[in-house]
């Protein structure tokens, strides 16, 4: 039994039977391997949009974006695993959501709602289920949620627009 595990589905304990990517799971090093999908949500005019799962891995921003000029960014990192019975689980993503919310507050960034954080992470993992290593391989799917000031800012002040993204890599 995985204690404090979070199953990657909205209802029930769905077992993923999707065929895994053909990788040498036992010999993967820690590095970036582009997966198929990622989550993107934008903050503008005081509100976060619903966000989308997309195949587009490109981030396009102004040379004067808050993240580039004043390093207004924060991130988290967590992992997804396949259990012996075929479930895909993450360990306590709610705690990552809380830490990211705390980081955002410290940086005068809008908090991405914690429940939406968990939903976005789970949706991204589910969209990349074929990239979650098989049980017993010793590998995991690394999940990187991050947020940054995306609009042009000159002068020391917080940005007014932000982007929250989640990508995965085995």
Model-derived segments and spans:
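Conserved alpha/beta cores of soluble small-molecule-handling proteins
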Residues: 2-170
């Amino acid at each position: 039994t995985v204690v404090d595990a979070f199953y990657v589905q909205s209802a029930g304990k769905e077992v993923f039977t999707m065929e895994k990517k053909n990788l040498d799971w036992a010999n993967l090093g820690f590095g970036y391997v582009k997966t198929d999908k990622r989550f993107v949500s934008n903050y503008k005019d005081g509100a976060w949009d619903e966000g989308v799962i997309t195949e587009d891995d490109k981030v396009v921003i102004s040379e004067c974006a808050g993240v580039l000029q004043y390093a207004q960014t924060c991130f988290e990192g967590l992992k997804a695993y396949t259990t012996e019975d075929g479930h895909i689980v993450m360990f306590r993503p709610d705690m990552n959501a809380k830490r990211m919310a705390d980081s955002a507050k410290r940086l005068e960034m809008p908090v991405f709602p914690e429940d939406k954080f968990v939903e976005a992470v789970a949706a991204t993992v589910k969209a990349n289920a074929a990239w979650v290593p098989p049980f017993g391989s010793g590998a995991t799917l690394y999940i990187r949620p991050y947020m940054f000031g995306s609009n042009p800012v000159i002068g020391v002040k917080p940005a007014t627009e932000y982007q929250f993204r989640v990508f995965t890599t085995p």
